């Protein structure tokens, strides 16, 4: 199976946000006077994974990003990701919909 380039899968805005996150993680590591190999050892990850995180690579797992943040004591704001209380669009949509179950709008064609 052919791999699809990240630029084809992700928006330029998202890729830029990941690059900025990687830069902030790199800055946090440097402020703690940790080399990449030191952070990799503390996190139980490879140095190449730390490099990928610091570049903001989208193919690197969310778990790896979160674990590195945790190792450096920077994981507190992870709870804010996809927080239903902060999802203005989701809240607005929930008030406009009476039905709480998610169902397909049309009947699925199971005839294959």
Residue ranges of predicted features:
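Short alpha-helical DNA-recognition segment
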Residues: 33-51
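Helix-turn-helix DNA-binding elements, focusing on the entry/boundary residues of the two helices
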Residues: 25, 36, 47, 62-65
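Short basic helix-loop element that most often maps to the first helix and adjoining turn
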Residues: 23-38, 100-106
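Short, charged recognition helix plus adjacent turn
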Residues: 79-112
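Short, basic-rich loop-to-helix N-cap that marks the start of a DNA-contacting helix
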Residues: 57-70
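A short, Lys/Arg-rich alpha-helix, primarily the initiator
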Residues: 6-31
């Amino acid at each position: 199976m052919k791999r699809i380039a990240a630029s084809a899968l992700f928006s330029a805005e998202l890729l830029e946000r990941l690059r900025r996150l990687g830069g902030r993680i790199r800055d946090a590591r440097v402020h703690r006077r940790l080399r990449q190999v030191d952070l990799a050892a503390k996190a139980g990850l490879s140095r190449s994974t730390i490099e990928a995180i610091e570049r903001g690579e989208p193919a690197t797992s969310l778990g790896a990003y979160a674990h590195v943040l945790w190792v450096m004591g920077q994981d507190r704001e992870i709870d804010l990701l996809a927080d239903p209380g902060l999802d203005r669009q989701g809240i607005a949509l929930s008030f406009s919909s009476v039905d709480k179950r998610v169902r397909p709008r049309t009947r699925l064609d199971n005839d294959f």
